[in-house]
């Protein structure tokens, strides 16, 4: 289907925080509780609508293991948006955010939009990281912040779409050079069209994989 823009995303964070589950919930609207670990990088895509324009999201789901970190780094370079995910029930995944963020900012373009996601909000009784802590980290580092549940789908749609809205606003403001695909943005065949059909509910294809 024709689109006005293509935005490339990367999903990063420790193993087991639910990165693959978030992607699967967004692209296929389903939750798969048992997964193999993601090996290297997997891929998903979906069309959304922003400001009457079709936007294709091309989403790269990365492995959280240290042994795959060099592979992950190579995907930062062509990303317009990053979803940095931690698990609200595991304090260590929150403590590692600074390392992930430093890595992302070192290897990406300076305008990349980063959404901080506290996942597994359905497991409130096992919470180790307060929502206020996530909000404070996001404020300190200039990130967008949301808590999500890949299991119940709470805020999953919003996390992906709000990231896209932020990228779109930066395009309108002239922050992104849309002629440079290294910024993670590609102009599509529908660019400039005024009458876009709504495809916000259209799913994409996601390779099978782990919730890592």
Curated annotation (Swiss-Prot):
Whether Magnesium counts among this entry's keywords is yes
One GO MF term on file is:
G protein activity
Query: Which ranges does the record mark as transmembrane?
Result: none
**How is the protein disposed in the membrane?**
Lipid-anchor
Domain of life, source organism: Eukaryota
Tell me what controls its activity.
Regulated by guanine nucleotide exchange factors (GEFs) which promote the exchange of bound GDP for free GTP, GTPase activating proteins (GAPs) which increase the GTP hydrolysis activity, and GDP dissociation inhibitors (GDIs) which inhibit the dissociation of the nucleotide from the GTPase.
- Which residues bind Mg(2+) per the record? 20, 38, 61
Short sequence motif Switch 2: positions: 63-72
Q: Where is this motif: Switch 1?
A: 37-42
**Which keywords describe this protein according to UniProt?**
Acetylation, Cytoplasmic vesicle, Endoplasmic reticulum, ER-Golgi transport, Golgi apparatus, GTP-binding, Hydrolase, Lipoprotein, Magnesium, Membrane, Metal-binding, Nucleotide-binding, Prenylation, Protein transport, Transport
Question: Which SUPFAM superfamilies does this one have?
Answer: P-loop containing nucleoside triphosphate hydrolases
Residues annotated as region Required for interaction with PRKCI?
Answer: 2-19
Q: In which tissues is it expressed?
A: Brain and parietal cells.
Which amino acid positions bind GTP, per UniProt? 16-21, 38, 64, 119-120, 122, 150-151
One GO cellular component assignment for this chain's record is: Golgi membrane
Any GO BP annotation: Golgi organization
* EC numbers: 3.6.5.2
Q: Which residues carry this modification: N-acetylalanine?
A: 2
Protein role? The small GTPases Rab are key regulators of intracellular membrane trafficking, from the formation of transport vesicles to their fusion with membranes. Rabs cycle between active GTP-bound and inactive GDP-bound states. In their active state, drive transport of vesicular carriers from donor organelles to acceptor organelles to regulate the membrane traffic that maintains organelle identity and morphology.
Q: What family is this protein classified in? A: Belongs to the small GTPase superfamily. Rab family.
Assembly description: Interacts with PRKCI. Interacts with TRIP11. Interacts (in GTP-bound form) with GARIN1B. Interacts (GTP-bound) with HOPS complex component VPS39; interaction contributes to obtaining a functional HOPS complex that promotes autophagosome-lysosome membrane fusion driven by STX17-SNAP29-VAMP8. May interact with VPS41.
Q: Entry's NCBIfam families? A: small_GTP
Q: Which protein, by its recorded name, is this?
A: Ras-related protein Rab-2A
């Amino acid at each position: 289907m024709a689109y006005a823009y293509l935005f490339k995303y990367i999903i990063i964070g420790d193993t087991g925080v639910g990165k693959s589950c978030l992607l699967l919930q967004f692209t296929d609207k389903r939750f798969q509780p048992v997964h193999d670990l993601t090996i290297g990088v997997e891929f998903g895509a979906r069309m959304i609508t922003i400001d009457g324009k079709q936007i294709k999201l091309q989403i790269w789901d990365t492995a959280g293991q240290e042994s795959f970190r060099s592979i992950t780094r190579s995907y930062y370079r062509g990303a317009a948006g990053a979803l940095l995910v931690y698990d609200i029930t595991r304090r260590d995944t929150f403590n590692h955010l600074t390392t992930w963020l430093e890595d992302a900012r070192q290897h990406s373009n300076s305008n990349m939009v980063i959404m901080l996601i506290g996942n597994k909000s359905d497991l409130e009784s096992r919470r180790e990281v307060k929502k206020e802590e996530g909000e404070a980290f996001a404020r300190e580092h200039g990130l967008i912040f949301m808590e999500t549940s890949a299991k119940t789908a709470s805020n999953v749609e919003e996390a992906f779409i709000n990231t896209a809205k932020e990228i779109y606003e930066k395009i309108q403001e002239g922050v992104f050079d849309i002629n440079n695909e290294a910024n993670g943005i590609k102009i599509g065949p529908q660019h400039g069209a005024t009458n876009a059909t709504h495809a916000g509910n259209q799913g994409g294809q996601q390779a099978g994989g782990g919730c890592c």
